[in-house]
């Protein structure tokens, strides 16, 4: 229903306009207070690059963070990551992740980033506190924030916005009548716009999410996704249809698709209830980090990697490297 409202296919968005005006007024006032110096942003001792979005959920932001961290690591740069940790509830904050940290504590995306990159990761609603905890735990040369474009309490040196190239900005209204956290005009003020799928517009960097081999959660076995049989596909991400469309492009038509809420907690019994005898389960990598502790032999996940268009991607990296060197 919310997708229909935000896409303009339902007139219910009109009823939500008063709340959207209030949201826009408050968010605009907060940003203006930092611009006018009425509030002071905390500046980290190392450069900060924000990877965020203008809309709520499902734009491909986390794969961009993973790509950026890996690119920096390949160039000998120690990158750290801070995140809000949506979906997690830790005993205390800030929380610096380690090998024993669970998605229930830190959230699924921070755990995914930590496992994929090995980079130090800290979570807190207060990003400045997360950075300070990270600096006390490791020696990063640069901080990448997973989300946080609207968290103006943390000063930043570069801003990168990830846009869903197919859905773009829906009906263009602020939350909750539309998907917008800020107006689309904000794109003119950021350092780079990365467009996930669809058609990149002038000045934007085109990106595709390329699937790898399906990975078994228990054994680590890898195989082409189209060799799996009798598959139930499960996606608890911001925009599940993108995952299901990816499977179709890979030559796999699931017997059933299951869309879950983004960051939804998962229990073994609930997941098993999705399957009938003889069926296999295929999920996103973000869901896999929540299911690994109780995975069964016939559970698989499909990792994706961000591929950015050249030469724009190299230029973006060069611009970021100038902050460090």
From Swiss-Prot:
Enzyme class, UniProt record, top EC level: transferase
Amino acids binding ATP: 55-62
- Would you tell me the protein name for this molecule? Tetraacyldisaccharide 4'-kinase
Q: What are the annotated GO cellular component locations?
A: plasma membrane
An example of a Gene Ontology BP annotation on this entry? Answer: lipid A biosynthetic process
Keywords attached to this Swiss-Prot or TrEMBL record, sorted alphabetically, are: ATP-binding, Kinase, Lipid A biosynthesis, Lipid biosynthesis, Lipid metabolism, Nucleotide-binding, Transferase
The pathway to which it is assigned is: Glycolipid biosynthesis; lipid IV(A) biosynthesis; lipid IV(A) from (3R)-3-hydroxytetradecanoyl-[acyl-carrier-protein] and UDP-N-acetyl-alpha-D-glucosamine: step 6/6
**Stored PANTHER family:** TETRAACYLDISACCHARIDE 4'-KINASE, TETRAACYLDISACCHARIDE 4'-KINASE, MITOCHONDRIAL-RELATED
* Pfam families noted in UniProt: LpxK (PF02606)
């Amino acid at each position: 229903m919310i997708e229909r409202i935000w896409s303009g296919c339902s007139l219910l968005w009109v009823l939500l306009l008063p709340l959207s005006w209030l949201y826009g007024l408050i968010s605009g006032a907060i940003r203006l207070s930092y611009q006018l110096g009425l509030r002071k942003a905390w500046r980290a001792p190392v450069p900060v690059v924000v990877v965020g979005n203008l809309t709520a959920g499902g734009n491909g932001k986390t794969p961009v963070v993973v790509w950026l961290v890996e690119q920096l690591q390949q160039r000998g740069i120690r990158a750290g990551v801070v995140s809000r940790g949506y979906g997690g509830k830790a005993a205390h904050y800030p929380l610096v992740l380690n090998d024993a940290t669970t998605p229930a504590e830190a959230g699924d995306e921070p755990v995914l980033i930590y496992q994929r990159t090995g980079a130090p990761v800290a979570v807190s609603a207060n990003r400045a506190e997360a950075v300070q905890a990270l600096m006390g735990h490791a020696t990063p040369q640069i901080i990448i924030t997973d989300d946080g474009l609207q968290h103006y309490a943390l000063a930043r040196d570069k801003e990168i916005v990830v846009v869903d190239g197919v859905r773009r900005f829906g009906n263009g209204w602020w939350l909750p009548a539309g998907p917008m956290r800020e107006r689309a005009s904000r794109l003119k003020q950021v350092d780079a716009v990365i467009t996930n799928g669809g058609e990149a517009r002038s000045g934007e960097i085109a990106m595709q999410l390329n699937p790898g081999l399906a990975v078994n959660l228990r054994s680590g076995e890898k195989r082409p996704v189209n060799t799996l049989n009798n598959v139930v596909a499960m996606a608890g991400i911001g925009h599940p249809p993108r995952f299901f469309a990816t499977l179709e492009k890979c030559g796999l038509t699931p017997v059933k698709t299951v869309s879950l809420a983004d960051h939804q907690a998962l229990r073994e019994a609930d997941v098993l209830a999705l399957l009938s005898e003889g069926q296999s389960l295929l999920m996103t990598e973000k869901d896999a980090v929540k299911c690994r502790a109780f995975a069964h032999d016939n559970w698989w996940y499909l990792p994706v990697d961000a591929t950015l268009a050249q030469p724009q991607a190299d230029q973006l990296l060069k611009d970021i490297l100038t902050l460090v060197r």
